[in-house]
Amino acid sequence: MCIRDRTVASGCANSAKSGVEALEAGDYKEAQAQFEKLTEEKDKKKSAEGYRGLAMTYYEQEEYTSALDAFKKAVDTGVVQTTQIYNLMGICAMKTEDYEAALEYIQAGLAMAETDMSGEEEKNSENGKDSAEMIQEMRYNEVVCYEKLADWENAKQKASEYLIEYPEDTAMEREAEFLETR
């Protein structure tokens, strides 16, 4: 089963302009250098944004262990915690096959999304990604994590809940059929 990952490089809204520009241009060496400078700032907010930018730089290079470490430092340093950050942390953990940690990040992100939703669809301002689409991705990946952990009952339950919400997802339909054999 594939991991859903629809995330696009974000603008890293509050990071150093040159780091963001380098990241968007695909100049990861320069982006990394700029964001590392930002992590050394005495201002915790700037430092946290530096770690977030560094995490995105590693993520874009598919260096998931380094990305996850940088995301953790960003959270520990006080970056504004968003559903997107927890989604990316979950994806990084999945890519490194740490499904227990991935499940924790995904569930934290989903809980955050539930408290953030005010009944109307909100746009994720960091990269224009619709929050509803990201939540769908996280719910899908939650099923994957349970499956990888061989927690068949929770995988079946979450797949069933997912299909009620997203009945058009044929990949999950096939997955639910597979899970019924477990």
Predicted segments with their positions:
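Conserved small/polar residues in nucleotide/adenosyl-binding loops
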Residues: M1-D5
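Start-of-helix register in tetratricopeptide repeats
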Residues: A13-N14, S47-E49, T83-Q84, D130, ...
